[in-house]
Amino acid sequence: MQSIFGTDGIRGRFDKEITYSLAYKVGYALGFIVKTNNPILIGRDTRISGEILFEAISKGIKDAGKEFIYLGICPTPAIPFLIKKEKFSSGIMISASHNPPEFNGIKIFDKNGEKIKRDFEKRIELIMARVDNNKIITNKYKSVSKNNELLNIYTKGLIDSMENENLEGMKIILDACYGSATTCAESVFKKLGANVKVINNDKDGLKINLNCGSTCLDPLNKAIKENDADMGFSFDGDADRVIGVDSKGNILDGDHILFLWGRELLEEKVLTNNTIISTRMANLGFERNWNNIGGILYRTEVGDKFIFAALKEKKALLGGEQSGHILSKINNFCGDGILTALQISKYCKKKNINLESWLNSSFLPYPQKLTNILLSFDFKNINNSNKDLINESIESFSSIKKNDCRVYIRPSGTEPVLRILVEAQNQKEVDFLSTKITTELRSKINKISNNL
């Protein structure tokens, strides 16, 4: 049987892959597994379906004989931070991160504030399979009060991470993406003295991630120019990732953040073996330039759980993904978009340098093209002959290594798409290869879809 867990928890469309029944079973299973009497912490992003899934999860936890505390709408990193600081037994974040509003998901954290590992996932799935469906009754929803003080503890932690540095004199735009960042990003930057303007700052679960946030930088770029700002940062739906933009519209993605932040740590001589961690999506230009200044880039499969494991294994201090998901020792290696934005702003202030100049001192990326092919089927669940049909092309194209060309193809672990990354030293080669690969794979995918 295929696992319900992907690269970042459980993810899918609400009322299709993610149902009340599934959420109840997850809550019940976690409550059954947890052995201490300390409550389970639950948070969510702004999606409309979040309230329904919270109701189901909390009912499951109660039916398993355990207690919970409801944080309400919050950034995902608040959950692991508070688990460690306030000694919760575990935690759940209800969010589909950067996905559209119709999606939702469930991320589970253990007693150490770490995303659960595969053996824990298997235990949850085993218990879920035993839950009597007759127990899952949708009662009339009873309002549950939120613990607002806990969010204040998290935001204080963000401010403390600045180590008495401030952001006075800096004009910064934030795109809160109608999501979790609406709860505290503005107040944190203001408390640190920044002149802040926030766009898309309503808690609107129908607009979350739509034409805004870390996957759509146009609104941020426009606001930076209109307000003559120094820089800006766009968060995703649950604020665990961030992308920056300088005053000229240049993009500071996760690769640039890792290079610049990593170089500071390299100069401070605190990086273990001069190593930072990223994934197979990381740009070759980033890797080559990082190597040129004496650094080592260790690549993992895509997903912050793989980065986290490598950080532990290599005893590294910094890792992340091109998408802006950055893990640092500051907050126990949990991706935190607000914290990352604060650190980048802090370095600009300390170095007395604008983000444009700092970004220009990093590296010139190789041309890349990322194409997503929508799948009408779950890649994990198709029969072996169909899977082999696609894998044959993936293996063939992935073996291309000529002229610093790189191809990486994978089914997404968070949404129904096949991702195709093509990278080379010139854009013409990238476009040619990308078109060739996409055309062949799309033809095979359509053939499979028509036969299902």
Swiss-Prot record:
**Which Pfam family, giving just one, matches this sequence?**
PGM_PMM_IV
Active-site residue numbers:
97
Q: Which residues are listed as membrane-spanning?
A: none
**InterPro entries linked to this entry:** A-D-PHexomutase_a/b/a-I, A-D-PHexomutase_a/b/a-I/II/III, A-D-PHexomutase_a/b/a-II, A-D-PHexomutase_a/b/a-III, A-D-PHexomutase_C, A-D-PHexomutase_C_sf, A-D-PHexomutase_CS, Alpha-D-phosphohexomutase_SF
GO molecular function per UniProt: magnesium ion binding; phosphoglucosamine mutase activity; phosphomannomutase activity
Q: Name one GO biological process term.
A: carbohydrate metabolic process
Q: How is it modified after translation?
A: Activated by phosphorylation.
Q: Does the keyword Cytoplasm apply?
A: no
Cofactor binding annotation: Binds 1 Mg(2+) ion per subunit.
Show the Gene3D superfamilies listed in the entry.
Alpha-D-Glucose-1,6-Bisphosphate, subunit A, domain 3, Alpha-D-phosphohexomutase, C-terminal domain
Cellular component per GO? cytosol
Required cofactor names: Mg(2+)
Catalysis: reaction(s)? alpha-D-glucosamine 1-phosphate = D-glucosamine 6-phosphate
Which residues participate in Mg(2+) binding? 97, 236, 238, 240
User: EC number(s) per UniProt?
Assistant: 5.4.2.10
Which residues in this protein are found as Phosphoserine?
Answer: 97
Sorted UniProt keywords: Isomerase, Magnesium, Metal-binding, Phosphoprotein
Q: What does this protein do?
A: Catalyzes the conversion of glucosamine-6-phosphate to glucosamine-1-phosphate.
What is this protein's name?
Answer: Phosphoglucosamine mutase
* Originating organism: Prochlorococcus marinus (strain MIT 9515)
